[in-house]
Every structure is written in structure tokens, then in C-alpha cells.
């Protein structure tokens, strides 16, 4: 099942029949671990990503980076309550000191694909997504990469075995494969880095 990590977390909490949870953030994984819904000993950070500021290819925006992000008329981000990229965006914008002043210009999306779409179609002047998402679209370009100093933790993608799985061996095999050099080679092709 593919969806935002927050939505997948909620589905697992409601009993979704799943074997493995591959999250785009540590918060959702930690919540499921704390609820004993993911086996703690199976969790590892497989990948790392970056948060980036994007604009449409044909955009005439004057926003040149995080320093003047407040100049944007509409800023698309994932909903911070359910979308990890949105949570990271909120953290970065809060640490920049602009979160409160841009509330009326935020367009909250249900996942990063919706953020991309809003920027691609210029329904939003700019957006905040992961670098790998930006790289997947030929209709957007990266304006700036979020400085790590704006985030308390790096953008890590943990994976873990769902405690209720009836397929423990298969889940462990999948996790082992996704952590392998062979899989990492493919992930790197799409802009990911090895997680810590």
C-alpha cells in the first residue's frame, strides 16, 4: 500500500494487514514502535533524503531561496499532521521564523505528489518536497536545498517489521534485501543516500 507515512501509520494502528512498514520519517515509525505495532529490533534507517524548495519550470517567481520564501503568494506543503515532508517543512519554516506569517498562503496537501502537482500546474508558486520527488518531475526545478541546521533530525527513511505479520521470515528477507548494496545502488540512482 502506498500513501503518506502518517496515513499508513493510522491504517496500521487500525489493524491494516501489513508485513513491513517503510516510512518517510522516524516520527511515524517511533509511534508504531512505542505502541508495539512494529518490532523494535527490526527497525533500521535505510535511506536519507533532503528537503528542497521547488518552483514550476516556467515560473516567474521572485523567490530565490529560503531567505525570501515569505514573498511567495501560495506555498504548497504536505499537511504536517500526516505527511512527513510537511512536518519537516513546518519545522524548517518555523526555525526560519516565517511559519506564523505565511499561514494564509499555505496550501496543505495530502502527500508530496499533490504538492508536486500544485507546483507543476502553477496552482502554487513554490513548494517544499523531498529532493527525490523533485527529481521525478521534469516540470519543476529546485530553487534551494534546505540547510540541515533548520531541521532537528535528518530526513531518514526507517523500515521495520509490523508486529502482527503472519509472514515474519518473508518480511525479514524483504528488509534485508532493501538494506543490501544491490538495493542501495537502485535507491542512489533516484537521489537517495544511505541512511545512518
Positions of PLM-derived features:
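Periplasmic-binding protein-like
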Residues: 19-23
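Exported/periplasmic ABC-transporter solute-binding proteins
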Residues: 6, 10-14, 25-26, 30-36, ...
